[in-house]
């Protein structure tokens, strides 16, 4: 493998055996591709905005004299970039401009004569844009649109599994689900009649819909039944014989023909009998006359002479009827063929219960069901039925729906109309009847072939279409109002409904979620989340067990591990690592093609439907070097079951062992040794890890760390190769390689880094460069680390030296004992940034004012404010300190004469304002790191705002001019090269000032042209600089667009440093979570023979019952990795020669049987080897991929190489007494995370505070500054003790006895420590509730 210069800094030893056939795909593509499809101009008009416009336009007036046509659209440039939007609290969006054409036709002239055409570009609101990382900035906060897993449109056949009716009879049903429009359900009732429902309303006999489609009873019977023909010859009854139909029947008479008896009466008719009848070519047999009684006529029989209807279709025949028919000359009688086994008489029975008999009555019946209470007219009934399923405006199956529909009915073509046809409805009924007759299977609705993914683009398009449809109505009205000659397209279109629909979706849809920004992994997982909830999806309460369960088709598509615990379990899933969606929105997963028993590197993506037809081998099947399977029998999956197949039956093979799991689960080493429940907790808890002050790469990883760190977008990644020309904390400049430059550019890439910004979860986002000056860079190298990344690898926690042993009960019930050293070294110290805002509004009594002149506040409280009343940057503040001084005018109060006199003497006027300053919340303390002031247009800016503005302008100018200098330097170096090549002496150039170089002329024409080109670029560069500076200046100095009534907003950012402390929650990656019980002095911690103390002591009882053995293997492997690091460290300290180092590190990389990773240190220079060794001092990082990890033997080999005991256990000594512990203890290195459940955020105390309005009881929760609930069980406890007075106090004066509370206060002030409990307020509430039920209840005074 070839490593770039940056990758050589630290190479993770990989224990994976299976070759990596397919690279891990870009992890955010599900979001970015979907939105790209929405925004991109699509010439076919299949997707996105184009599809929405084409489906609504052209809009015609009611009269048809004019229409508004759509031509094209374009998206403008966003006003602010992403960072500016976040600071200002606005939406990152682009204006949508649509070119429309208004066509007016001549009224009197023939059809289609155009009178006038007007074309115009119309503004249609703002469309929020997706950032490069797959998020949206809505009102200044980053949000993610979660993809939805919903039932695919199409037709589904299902049964109630015998649960509806008490008899346990299985009732079958079919449901046609369109993408938009009414649902159509067919269902059997317990009497086997077929019914239809539209939109889950009242059910009607299914034949009504056929009559509404203009079928007569005869035609209906003709569609669904085969015929049995009887003929009357010589007063005998002959039946046309179709031998197949007799199979399984019992003969009710002798079956004979040509004097030969084929079946005797009472015998079962078998296949042998049928073969004989067919062989002798028997076409007719004679039947007794009684046999026809009970058969059903298949058509109307009319007496030719009188025209009287003797026997209508679907009537049961009797002997009398037969005689009548015979008399009127009907010798040939057709009846319906039915039997109890596989040709049920369902439709015939349904026709009998059908009250209608022609098209009109059927339409009226449907109208009554859909619009109860409205008087039906013929036109209304016809148009309602037409619009239900046969109008493109109201009904659309969509391409997916049509494809699923046709596949389900086994048709050949998969494309077709989006509306239903007569044939569609009839075929669905036929298939449903076939299933009832025992032919065919019902569908599995949890199969991923029947559920599809709706991503951002599609949902945004649907919302946009909703907005357009609202506009359409208004446009139709306007077009019909007349006076079109003066109107232009923009007078027709009101953009409000469109932007309202889009805004509503992005702002408040259930699937538009506040991004989880705890760490890079939580961001990526949130964007790859798949929810079954949301509009058009399931609800938590209704979702049963089956929907939530893992389905065989989830394999490689949806992760079976990562899902929340609690009410949403199984409804919210995560996309597997390699999964992607196909054009129809179904999930696909990649497989390697197997041809003639040889596994190729050809990759095919299969959806769940296609996968069912193949035999698929697992990724860990053993192959020889030619790609043949080694074993004769291979474990494979086929049709959702796993079993053994011979090697020549195999069609495909899994791509990778990680293919089953999601990104979160693929980061857990030794996942294969953990119980699934704990793995689920581990995957979920990694997302809650808080980024530590100094990120520390995991010693034991899975090799996915780099992919997650790079794809999450928190790191700065090189777009093009080159060398590092300049680097400081906030900017990296790369001089691009010649071969990667675009013609005619300066060849400089500038990366500006994010410094100390607040994330959605109040954690700190900060990027730090990890490259040095002059280093060569390749495309895709990581240039700067973000939060929780270390040298371009995800680093959520810290490597801790752990021991599994009890320690004085401090690790009882999963508690964690931590060494003081962890606190001293700031291993788990995190920075949290809080944003506090102060809003100055315009009130009825006058504007609020931000000022340092606050009434009744001492000097000390104002010491941290400047003259504008805003806190200084760098001030250390604690709870209750004033951050922004603000006063609000209050109404004039009536003053007493004395007060008036004092006022007159002292000129006091301070009492007409009250203090409404922004203060630091209780329990919070930190340092002010930034202040921002937003002022409304037209409001005078205060001194502080102007200072900030000045500073921003200076900074912007400095940034831009530095950028210009860098680009200029790059350009001039190229000019220099051209001039020297053109024959100008270097000495002469060095003496001339740079800007005079461009005036020199060259004799060589080609070189002169190049020089002129470069001169043009130089002018353009300067012009661009001026333009950019002006734009920046305008943005900084212009007023801000604030909400109505708001004059000023001051935002103060506090940085809080949180050290680890007892009560904080920590966890490993295997679901092993616990709370810190004690921080122990270093000298008391258990230590080994060398005196190295452990950092963390964990309870060994947490392992066996939880069955997460992965943590033990991780501990052993971590120990080995550290041991090798220690040996490298010792060699570096002794300054041994590079050859020895190279040899030892090479041994470590080569260890392990047939591993796929090949590291050849001979290709490294000495300097590179030394730098690699420097980075391996703290331990050699190791990758053990999921399901393909290090074996026990390999861990032992690695331990041996590090001179450590292969048991993984060492003798420890008690730090307090120095005595040796009784038996060896498992000690090693485990990766521990600090979770975002910090005791500081949860600790809370109250003595008095706010009370609930109705019950007058204290509120609950920290946010409301509430009390602790003394609940039912606590009351029982006091009752059991007999502590009557304590109980009385709890339930009255300490809770909701309003008078008692105030009396108590007075008593305490007076020094009288007694209480007088009264009536609790909640008792009055109870009385009122009883009275509201109409029961009078009165309390009698004694």
UniProtKB/Swiss-Prot annotation:
Provide an example Pfam family for this protein.
RNA_pol_Rpb2_1
Look up the EC number in the record and give it. Answer: 2.7.7.6
Q: Name one GO molecular function term.
A: DNA-directed RNA polymerase activity
The alphabetical list of record keywords is:
DNA-directed RNA polymerase, Nucleotidyltransferase, Transcription, Transferase
Keyword check for Nucleotidyltransferase: yes
SUPFAM superfamilies reported for this sequence: beta and beta-prime subunits of DNA dependent RNA-polymerase
Please, one GO biological process term?
Answer: DNA-templated transcription
Per its record, the protein catalyses: RNA(n) + a ribonucleoside 5'-triphosphate = RNA(n+1) + diphosphate
Record has Protein transport as a keyword: no
A GO cellular component annotation here is: DNA-directed RNA polymerase complex
Alphabetical list of InterPro entries matching this protein: DNA-dir_RNA_pol_bsu_ext_1_sf, DNA-dir_RNA_pol_bsu_external_1, DNA-dir_RNA_pol_su2, DNA-dir_RNAP_su2_dom, DNA-dir_RNAP_su2_hyb_sf, RNA_pol_bsu_bac, RNA_pol_bsu_CS, RNA_pol_bsu_protrusion
Q: According to its UniProt entry, what is the function of this protein? A: DNA-dependent RNA polymerase catalyzes the transcription of DNA into RNA using the four ribonucleoside triphosphates as substrates.
Give the PANTHER family listed for this entry.
DNA-DIRECTED RNA POLYMERASE I SUBUNIT 2
HAMAP family in the cross-refs = RNApol_bact_RpoB
Its assembly, as annotated, is:
The RNAP catalytic core consists of 2 alpha, 1 beta, 1 beta' and 1 omega subunit. When a sigma factor is associated with the core the holoenzyme is formed, which can initiate transcription.
Q: Which family does it belong to?
A: Belongs to the RNA polymerase beta chain family.
Specify the protein name: DNA-directed RNA polymerase subunit beta
Q: What is the lineage of its organism?
A: Bacteria, Pseudomonadati, Pseudomonadota, Gammaproteobacteria, Enterobacterales
Give the gene name: rpoB
């Amino acid at each position: 493998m070839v490593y770039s210069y940056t990758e050589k800094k630290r190479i993770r030893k990989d224990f994976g055996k299976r070759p990596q056939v397919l690279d891990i795909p870009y992890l955010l593509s599900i979001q970015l591709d979907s939105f790209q499809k929405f925004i991109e101009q699509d010439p076919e008009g299949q997707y996105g905005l184009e599809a929405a416009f084409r489906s609504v336009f052209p809009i015609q007036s009611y009269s048809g004299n004019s229409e508004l046509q759509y031509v094209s659209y374009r998206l403008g440039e966003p006003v602010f970039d992403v960072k500016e939007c976040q600071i200002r609290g606005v939406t990152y969006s682009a204006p949508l401009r649509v070119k429309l054409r208004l066509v007016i036709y001549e009224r009197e002239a023939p059809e289609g004569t155009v009178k006038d055409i007007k074309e115009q570009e119309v503004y249609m609101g703002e469309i929020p844009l997706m950032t490069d990382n797959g998020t949206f900035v809505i009102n200044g906060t980053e949000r993610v649109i979660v993809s939805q897993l919903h039932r695919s449109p199409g037709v589904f056949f299902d049964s109630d599994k015998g649960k509806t009716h008490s008899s346990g009879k299985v009732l079958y049903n079919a449901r046609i689900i369109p993408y938009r429009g009414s649902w159509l359900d067919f269902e059997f009732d317990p009497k086997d009649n077929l019914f239809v429902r539209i939109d889950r309303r009242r059910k009607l006999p299914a034949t009504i819909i056929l009559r509404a489609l203009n079928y007569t009873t005869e035609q209906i019977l003709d569609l669904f039944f085969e015929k049995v023909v009887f003929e009357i010859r010589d007063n005998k009854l002959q039946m046309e014989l179709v031998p197949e139909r007799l199979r399984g029947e019992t003969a009710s008479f002798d079956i004979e023909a040509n004097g030969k008896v084929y079946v005797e009466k009472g015998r079962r008719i078998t296949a042998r009998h049928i073969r004989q009848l067919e062989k002798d070519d028997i076409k007719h047999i004679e039947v007794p006359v009684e046999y026809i009684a009970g058969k059903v006529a298949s058509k109307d029989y009319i007496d030719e002479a009188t025209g009287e209807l003797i026997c209508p279709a679907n009537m049961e025949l009797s002997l009398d009827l037969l005689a009548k028919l015979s008399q009127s000359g009907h010798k040939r009688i057709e009846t319906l063929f039915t039997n109890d086994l596989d040709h049920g008489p369902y439709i015939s029975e349904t026709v009998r219960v059908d009250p209608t008999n022609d098209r009109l009555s059927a339409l009226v019946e449907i109208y009554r069901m859909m619009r109860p209470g409205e008087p039906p007219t013929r036109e209304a009934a016809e148009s309602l039925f037409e619009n239900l399923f046969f109008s493109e405006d109201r009904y659309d199956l969509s391409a997916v729906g049509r494809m699923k529909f046709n596949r389900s009915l086994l048709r050949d073509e998969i494309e077709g109309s989006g509306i239903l046809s007569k044939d569609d409805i009839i075929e669905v009924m036929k298939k449903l009847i076939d299933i009832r007759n025992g032919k065919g299977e019902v569908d599995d609705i949890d199969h991923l072939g029947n559920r599809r993914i709706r991503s951002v683009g599609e949902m945004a398009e649907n919302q946009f279409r909703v907005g357009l449809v609202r506009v359409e109505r208004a446009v139709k009205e306007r077009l019909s109002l007349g006076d079109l000659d003066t109107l232009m397209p923009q007078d027709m279109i009101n953009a409000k409904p469109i932007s309202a629909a889009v805004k509503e979706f992005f702002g408040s849809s259930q699937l538009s979620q506040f991004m989880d920004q705890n760490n890079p992994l939580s961001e990526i997982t949130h964007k790859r989340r798949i929810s079954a909830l949301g509009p058009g999806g399931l609800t938590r309460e209704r979702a049963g067990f089956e929907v939530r369960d893992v389905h065989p088709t989830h394999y490689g598509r949806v992760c079976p591990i990562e899902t929340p615990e609690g009410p949403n379990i199984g409804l919210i899933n995560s996309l597997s690592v390699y999964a992607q969606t196909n054009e129809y929105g179904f999930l696909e997963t990649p497989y390697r093609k197997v041809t003639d028993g040889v596994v190729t590197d050809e990759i095919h993506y299969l959806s769940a439907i296609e996968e069912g037809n193949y035999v698929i081998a697992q990724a860990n099947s053993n192959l020889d070097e030619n790609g043949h399977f080694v074993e004769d029998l291979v474990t494979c999956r086929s049709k959702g079951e796993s079993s053994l197949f011979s090697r020549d039956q195999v069609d495909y093979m899994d791509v990778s062992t990680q293919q089953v799991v999601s990104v979160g689960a693929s980061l857990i080493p030794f996942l294969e040794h953990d119980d699934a429940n704990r793995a689920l907790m581990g995957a979920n808890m990694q997302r809650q890890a808080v980024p530590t002050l100094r990120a520390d790469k995991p010693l034991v990883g899975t090799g996915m760390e780099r992919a997650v760190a790079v794809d999450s977008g928190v790191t700065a990644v090189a777009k093009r190769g080159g060398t590092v020309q300049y680097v400081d904390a906030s900017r990296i400049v790369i001089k691009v390689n010649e071969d990667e430059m675009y013609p005619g550019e300066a060849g400089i890439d500038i990366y500006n880094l994010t410094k100390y910004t607040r994330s959605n979860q109040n954690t700190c986002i900060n990027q730090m460069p990890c490259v040095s000056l002059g280093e060569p860079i390749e495309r895709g190298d990581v240039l700067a680390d973000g939060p929780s990344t270390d040298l371009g690898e995800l680093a959520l926690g810290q490597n801790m030296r752990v021991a599994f042993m009890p320690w004085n009960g401090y690790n009882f019930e999963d508690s964690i004992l931590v060494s003081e050293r962890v606190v001293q070294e700031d291993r788990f110290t995190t920075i949290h940034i809080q944003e506090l805002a102060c809003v100055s509004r315009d009130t009825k009594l006058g504007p609020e004012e931000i000022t340092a002149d606050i009434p009744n506040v001492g000097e000390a409280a104002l010491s941290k404010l400047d003259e504008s009343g805003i806190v200084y940057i760098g001030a250390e503040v604690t709870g209750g300190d004033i951050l922004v001084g603000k006063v609000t005018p209050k109404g004039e109060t009536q003053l007493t004469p004395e007060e008036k006199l004092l006022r007159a003497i002292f000129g006091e006027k301070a009492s007409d304002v009250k203090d409404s300053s922004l203060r630091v919340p209780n329990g919070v303390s930190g340092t002010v790191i930034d202040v921002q002031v937003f002022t409304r247009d037209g409001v005078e800016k205060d001194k502080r705002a102007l200072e900030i503005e000045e500073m921003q302008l200076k900074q912007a100018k400095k940034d831009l001019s530095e950028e210009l200098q860098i680009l200029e330097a790059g350009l001039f170096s190229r000019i220099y090269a051209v001039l020297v090549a053109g024959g100008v002496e270097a000495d002469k150039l060095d003496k001339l000032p740079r800007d005079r170089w461009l005036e020199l002329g060259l004799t060589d024409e080609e070189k002169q042209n190049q020089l002129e080109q470069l001169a043009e670029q130089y002018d353009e560069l300067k012009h661009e600089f001026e333009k950019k500076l002006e734009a920046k200046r305008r943005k900084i100095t212009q007023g801000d667009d604030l909400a109505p009534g708001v004059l000023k907003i001051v935002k103060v950012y506090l940085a809080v440093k949180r050290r680890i402390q007892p009560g904080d929650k920590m966890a490993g990656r295997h679901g092993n979570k616990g709370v810190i019980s004690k921080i122990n002095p270093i000298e008391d911690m258990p230590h080994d023979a060398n005196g190295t103390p452990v950092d963390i002591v964990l309870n060994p009882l947490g392992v066996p019952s939880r069955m997460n053995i992965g943590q033990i293997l991780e501990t052993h492997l971590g120990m080995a990795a550290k041991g090798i690091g220690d040996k490298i460290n010792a060699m570096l300290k002794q300054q041994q020669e590079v050859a020895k180092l190279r040899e030892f590190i090479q041994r470590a990389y080569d260890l392990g049987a047939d591993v796929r990773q090949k590291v050849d240190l001979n290709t490294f220079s000495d300097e590179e080897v030394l730098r690699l060794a420097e980075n391996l001092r703290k331990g050699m990082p190791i990758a053990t991929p999921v399901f393909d990890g290090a074996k026990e033997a390999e861990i032992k080999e690695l331990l041996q190489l590090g001179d450590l005991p292969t048991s993984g256990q060492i003798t420890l000594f008690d730090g307090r007494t120095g005595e040796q512990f009784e038996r060896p203890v498992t000690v090693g290195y485990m990766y521990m995370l600090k979770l975002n459940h910090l005791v500081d955020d949860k600790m809370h105390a109250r003595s008095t505070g706010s009370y609930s309005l109705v019950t007058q009881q204290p509120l609950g929760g920290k946010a409301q500054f509430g009390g602790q609930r003394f609940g039912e069980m606590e009351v029982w406890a006091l009752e059991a003790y007999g502590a009557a007075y304590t109980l009385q106090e709890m339930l009255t004066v300490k809770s909701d006895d309003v008078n008692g509370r105030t009396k108590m206060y007075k008593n305490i002030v007076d020094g009288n420590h007694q209480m007088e409990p009264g009536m609790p307020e909640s008792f009055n509430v109870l009385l009122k509730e009883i009275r509201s039920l109409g029961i009078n209840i009165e309390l009698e005074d004694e």
